[in-house]
Amino acid sequence: AMDTSEFQRLDKIRQLGGSSFVFPSATHTRKEHSVGTAHLALLVVRHLRNAQPELAIDDTDELCVGLAALLHDVGHGPYSHMWEPFVRRCTGDDSYSHEGMGARLVRRICTQIKLQEYIPEASVEFICACIEGLSDDAEWPFSHLSEDKRFLCDIVSNKRSGLDVDKWDYLNRDSVSTLGESSSGGFDVTRLVSAIRVVRGPSRCVGEVAFEEKVALDLNRIFKLRSEMHQMVYQHRVAIVAEAMITDAFLAASESEFRITATSEDGTSREFTLGEAASDCGAFTQLRDGLLETLQTSSASGLERTRQILERLNRREFYQEVGRGAILPTKPLCSECSSETEPRDRFCSQCGASTESRRWDLARRFENNDGRECTVVKPQLLSLSKEDCRRAILDRVEGDSVEEDDVLVGITDIKYGWGYQVPDAHHDRLSWQVRDPLAHVLFFNPKDDVERGYHIPSGKLSQLALPKSTHERVLYCYYRGDPSNTAALRALTEAYERYTKSLPGASAAGRSNPTPSPFARKRRMSGDGPPLPVLDRSGGRTLDMDDCLPPAKRYRDKF
């Protein structure tokens, strides 16, 4: 499977996409991550095979899980996750995903290497299921395989708890590549593998992956690292803008006469637009990160807009940020003072008003064990989309200096853990959708019952290990147009600020970089005359620049 063009192209696709514009060392590829994930998956399968012979894991099971881990990312396009929103906007296909394309490529690879000669043909679909994962309420789709093997689908992509070897590899690999080993806050994978066992849950008849209770804090560290990586790396505002510019360049190229010549799925050689190539397995294998350089040097007509964007990107002239980011509330808001409240609060801690009439949006409805219908809700502003915000900002722009296509809105969405339901303080059939890192993780005690697992309530963990908030959303607005157009920038800034002030519970986000020292703007280069005097605003005394040095250095320089 590794010796195919579908897999080898991953060596030309960076794992972190636009993050390399912020972290120059973030140049590792999807191929490295895929090999690492396959290694970890085989470690887990072999550990379970040796520790629990009763699971009847055979060579075919081990091969399927290993191939699923190795091929789980073959559906990624240029610049990884950025490719999917481009294809959706270009083709209008909102269902397009790298998982769907990956499943098609996996079937193509299995046909090329004649895998059906070694394992049952139905096992190819099992490999795809291991890549996509099975949700807790999904039916078991395979007749050739006992449902007792359902736990195998949790190893590569765990839809129950979110703890899988894919996440273990990319978090450790990405954090070391961007933040460095000393500050990455990594975790010991070998300790986690040795703590795995397949047990039955409290209300299930088939086994699922569980962990020894002693590694609960280690698992919490994984979710903590994930949220930190999203905040500092994956959803860094510069990385988001860089990827937005690349997306705009691809969209402009898709409207030009630029074509990719490739052999299609049916074996014929023809030309494809970028949108067409994204949906054809044959042409898709020709798409790599080098597509940007190809666009810059192509002689196809209609690429002027694409080259203009890429030239700005190369000069790091990113789209202009408008105003300051606005932190959007993620908890229920008090109907009186718009302060955030906890789902179980009966009264607002700020104004003392009752929380009975808090505003919400419907998340889902379901029937509980006694047949009663229950409603799961979420705070109202959690339903706010980027397009909703963009339209609202444009409606508040005064004059005609701002073009509609010049406004770009981004919302960073950082979650700490998996979602679960908390009952409302006033209504017994109403539950709020909140997040808890270990709510869906199954644990066992090797000194007690190794057949039945259990869940650990968040209150049992050390409160030092739990964050004050488990969900953060920040709204940003950018101007795509000419940054020298001060009239448009001023009009857009005023409209954006009016909009953020109208959002209940929203607050200004901090800057990514510290505010520069007032002294830094007045210093001269060394040897460029005497130091400039600086006014001490607190006492009115005129200071020399040497007074800004630490006392130890000031004392040393005198002698």
Q: What residue ranges belong to the model's regions?
A:
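A composition/biophysics-driven feature that prefers long, compositionally simple stretches
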Residues: 221, 341, 456-460
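Residues immediately within or flanking Cys/His clusters that coordinate Zn2+
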Residues: 331, 345
